[in-house]
């Protein structure tokens, strides 16, 4: 797997996007890493642009929906159209979802989330890359604003990014609070210590579990019911390390401090207990590489399984 994933420090994100989409990630420094083309992403409107590609598109889509559906006008106004930035909108939306009336006030939770996102701008850049990934990979995602408002996999991942920011600042109690609430509300349990890259799609997301010392690379797609867990016998660094461009099928379990190589595919229902090499398809319980295949050719980034979502395990 990519060495940069193994050495990746907490709360540090370097997002991969083609040059024309660098404005997706304000203040993001370009790297020499390969880039993934977000072919399905619409071009931003020329007028009224804020210079933030994703936020401009999100607001335009929200306005279109509000114009078409009067019932949704206040909803879209309160959560998107009245907000000055994607980070502000995200903090407000997550606070509305995760608050506990009478015990965890929405306004105080919003301030906590907004503070975490402001202190860690890399989390906002990652959220933008996640939105582009969902729009590009999920044929059911007609608009990025639908992913932003309605897709619990996206929302759970952004709650994790805020929790990870707090965890990295040694604010463990509020980080664990966000983890707990996200698990209760979204059915997705990601430990705030887990390190997760950009351009991630949690598709459907119900039942996804990611442990404390897990690392997930860039451009990874994970379906529902996936566990990146420990074996229950170790402490310390005990969770999987997932490379770039990996696709993990529904119901798969990857257990222990094993490495899943770049561009690998893990079949639905597989139980992975050993390392999986780059470009390899592993299926079964216990998971084994598919026999009789030639070594996978070096793929361009846009051809990696995590980007294409190609789920034919025998190719």
Swiss-Prot record:
Family annotation (SUPFAM superfamilies): Trimeric LpxA-like enzymes
GO molecular function: serine O-acetyltransferase activity
Catalytic activity: L-serine + acetyl-CoA = O-acetyl-L-serine + CoA
EC number: 2.3.1.30
EC class name: transferase
GO cellular component entries: cytosol
This protein's pathway: Amino-acid biosynthesis; L-cysteine biosynthesis; L-cysteine from L-serine: step 1/2
Gene3D superfamilies membership: Hexapeptide repeat proteins (2.160.10.10), serine acetyltransferase, domain 1 (1.10.3130.10)
One BP term from GO: cysteine biosynthetic process from serine
Disordered as annotated region, ranges: 287-315
Pfam families: Hexapep, SATase_N
Keywords attached to this entry: Acyltransferase, Amino-acid biosynthesis, Transferase
Subunit and interaction comment: Homomultimer.
Family: Belongs to the transferase hexapeptide repeat family.
PANTHER family the UniProt entry points to: SERINE ACETYLTRANSFERASE
Protein name in the entry: Probable serine acetyltransferase 4
Biological source species: Oryza sativa subsp. japonica
């Amino acid at each position: 797997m990519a060495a940069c994933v193994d050495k990746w420090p907490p709360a540090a994100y370097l997002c991969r996007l083609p040059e024309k989409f660098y404005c997706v990630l304000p203040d993001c420094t370009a790297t020499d890493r390969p880039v993934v083309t977000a072919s399905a992403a619409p071009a931003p409107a020329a007028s009224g642009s804020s210079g933030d590609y994703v936020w401009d598109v999100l607001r335009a889509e929200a306005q279109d929906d509000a114009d078409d559906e009067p019932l949704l006008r206040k909803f879209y106004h309160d959560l998107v159209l009245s907000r000055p930035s994607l980070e502000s909108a995200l903090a407000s939306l997550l606070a509305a979802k995760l608050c506990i009336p009478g015990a965890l006030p929405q306004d105080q939770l919003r301030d906590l989330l907004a503070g975490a996102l402001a202190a860690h701008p890399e989390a906002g850049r990652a959220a933008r890359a996640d939105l582009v990934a969902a729009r590009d990979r999920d044929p059911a995602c007609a608009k990025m604003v639908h992913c932003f408002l309605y897709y619990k996999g996206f929302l759970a991942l952004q709650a994790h990014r805020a929790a990870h920011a707090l965890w990295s600042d040694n604010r463990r109690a509020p980080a664990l609070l966000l983890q707990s609430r996200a698990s209760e509300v979204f059915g997705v349990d990601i430990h705030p210590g887990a390190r997760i890259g950009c351009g991630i799609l949690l598709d459907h997301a119900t039942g996804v579990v990611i442990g404390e010392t897990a690392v997930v690379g860039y451009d990874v797609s994970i379906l529902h019911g996936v566990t990146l867990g420990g074996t229950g016998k170790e402490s310390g660094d005990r969770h999987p390390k997932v490379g770039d461009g990996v696709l993990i099928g529904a119901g798969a379990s990857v257990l222990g401090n094993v490495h899943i190589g770049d561009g690998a595919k893990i079949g639905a229902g597989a139980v992975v207990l050993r390392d999986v090499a780059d470009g390899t398809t592993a299926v079964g319980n216990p998971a084994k590489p598919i026999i009789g295949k030639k070594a996978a050719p070096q793929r361009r980034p846009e051809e990696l399984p995590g980007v294409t979502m190609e789920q034919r395990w025998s190719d």
